[in-house]
Swiss-Prot record:
Keyword Phosphoprotein appears in the UniProt entry: no
Entry-linked Pfam families: Capsid_N, Capsid_NCLDV
Main location: virion
Membrane-traversing stretches: none
Species the sequence originates in: Rana tigrina ranavirus
Subunit structure: Homotrimer.
Family according to the record: Belongs to the NCLDV major capsid protein family.
Gene expressing this chain: MCP
UniProt KW keywords: Capsid protein, Late protein, Virion
Function of the molecule: Major capsid protein that self assembles to form an icosahedral capsid. Represents around 50% of the total virion protein mass.
Descriptive protein name: Major capsid protein
GO molecular function: structural molecule activity
Residue ranges the record marks as coiled coil: none
Gene3D superfamilies: Adenovirus Type 2 Hexon, domain 4 (2.70.9.10), Major capsid protein Vp54 (2.70.9.20)
Localisation per UniProt entry: Virion
Length: 463
């Protein structure tokens, strides 16, 4: 490895001598900021630690809901996550499908175990999200470096979502009991500047309510040669249908100095937060019509629209946004048949009688929009995005449209030829559409809103 001699360093001054009008415009003159002196911004001293949310009410059981109180042990809440232990599941030899029966959890187990989550202040909902939002949000915002770790957290692993044959069959195994973790994507969890100031809210009871799905809508009992799916019953499983689960909500609390605490408690503050809105779900049948529209009666400043056509043929097969139902593949794996493609062909956005977006092919919403305006392009089929914001995952406003000032805004979706074929049913064994496939159009909106913190309480000054 050679070193730069003194004459070589001297030649570097030639580069500096090329400074001209272009460089003056780009770099500035004598008042420009240097690259080599870092400015230090003193900030308030703090520390953080995990805390268990207590004051649980309700029953953490499948098909039930429970709520927990946000801990008052800290000054701010930085984030929250749900920890849930799945039960051990063993398929009996005497199950409905006999020696051909297999059992597995649905895709994205924690997304589907949790039907909805709501953050409330004195019973006023501040933010709520459901399974579809968890599916979509993770597809658009998950950095690739974290994806495998996230799958491990939510149970998207082979030991849970790959088919397990019945007792006595080759490859027979149990679905293990396992601790799963779901990071809850509340508005306060992505930016420390939006941390929830619980010390400023002594007059608000802050609670998180979690609704869990029934176990019958989470476990898939499927024939390993035909692909037929049967609703699971208690006699299929050793010990019957699992009921109660171990579930806890944890949060990271931040502790600040007394000076900052005193200043914070006496200051009126407006926070720009995010909320999730869900349009009424529409059942769509491409055999009746090729194009369907849904009215989007949203409110507030909408920054992004996310839409999917979900395959709802079997309630236990969740997070499926393709034309057909997955089947059991070689080696007891999950196989997506040939028609497991996007049910959407194209879509357009209309404001009253004005076309806001022309009929654009599905690649615009599933590839182009995420490429430019989201962190990630979805790895799963069937997710579509239109972002008004320059960065849909950034909590700082960078573009939106006030849907409260619009009337008759609608999304028009044209379904694909493959969806029409699958909707007719009649496919062969393991085609994924031996029975007629059913679809539902789901539309989600992410909007900005203002929370005002004043006199020890929170409220929404702009309804």
């Amino acid at each position: 490895m050679s070193s730069v001699t003194g004459s070589g360093i001297t030649s570097g001054f030639i580069d500096l001598a090329t400074y001209d009008n272009l460089e003056r415009a780009m770099y500035g003159g004598s008042d420009a900021t240097t690259y080599f002196v870092k400015e230090h911004y003193p900030v308030g001293w703090f520390t953080k630690l995990p805390s268990l949310a207590a004051k649980m009410s309700g029953n953490p059981a499948f098909g039930q809901q429970f709520s927990v109180g946000v801990p008052r042990s800290g000054d701010y809440i930085l984030n929250a996550w749900l920890v849930l232990k799945t039960p051990e599941v063993e398929l009996l030899a005497a199950n409905q499908l006999g020696e051909n029966g297999t059992i597995r959890w649905t895709k994205n187990p924690m997304h589907n175990i949790v039907e909805s989550v709501t953050l409330s202040f004195n019973d006023i909902s501040a933010q709520s999200f459901n399974t579809a939002y968890l599916d979509a949000w993770s597809e658009y915002t998950m950095p690739e470096a974290k994806r495998i770790g996230y799958y491990n957290m939510i149970g998207n692993t082979s030991d849970l979502i790959n088919p397990a044959p019945a007792t006595g069959q080759d490859g027979a195994r149990v679905l293990p009991a396992k601790n799963l973790v779901l990071p809850l994507p509340f508005f306060f969890s992505r930016d420390s500047g939006l941390a929830l100031p619980v010390v400023s809210l002594p007059y608000n009871e802050i609670r998180i309510t979690v609704k869990l799905r029934a176990i019958q809508d989470l476990l898939i009992l499927q024939h390993n040669t035909t692909g037929a799916i049967s609703p699971i019953v208690a006699s299929d499983l050793a010990g019957g249908l699992p009921d109660t689960v171990e579930a806890n909500v944890y949060m990271t609390v931040a502790l600040i100095t007394g000076d900052e605490r005193q200043a914070m408690s006496s200051t009126v503050r407006d926070m720009v937060v995010e909320q999730v809105q869900v349009a009424p779900v529409h059942m769509v049948n491409p055999r009746n019509a090729a194009t369907f529209h849904t009215d989007m009666r949203f409110s507030h400043a909408v920054k992004a629209l996310m839409f999917m056509v979900q395959n709802v043929t079997h309630p236990s097969v969740g997070s499926n946004y393709t034309c057909v139902t997955p089947v059991v593949g070689a080696g007891n794996t999950v196989l997506e048949p040939a028609l497991a493609v996007d049910p959407v062909k194209s879509a357009s956005l209309v404001y009253e009688n004005t076309t806001r977006l022309p009929d654009m092919g599905v690649e615009y919403y599933s590839l182009v929009e995420p490429w430019y305006y989201a962190t990630s392009i979805p790895v799963s089929t069937g997710h579509h995005l239109y972002s008004y914001a320059l960065s849909m995952q950034d909590p700082h406003p960078s573009g939106s449209t006030n849907y409260g000032r619009l009337t008759n805004a609608s999304l028009n979706v044209t379904l694909s030829a493959e969806a029409t074929t699958a909707a007719a049913g009649g496919g062969g064994d393991n085609s994924g559409y031996t029975t007629a496939q059913k679809y539902a159009l789901i539309v989600l909106a992410i909007n900005h809103n203002i929370i005002r913190i004043m006199n020890g309480s929170m409220g929404f000054p702009i309804l």
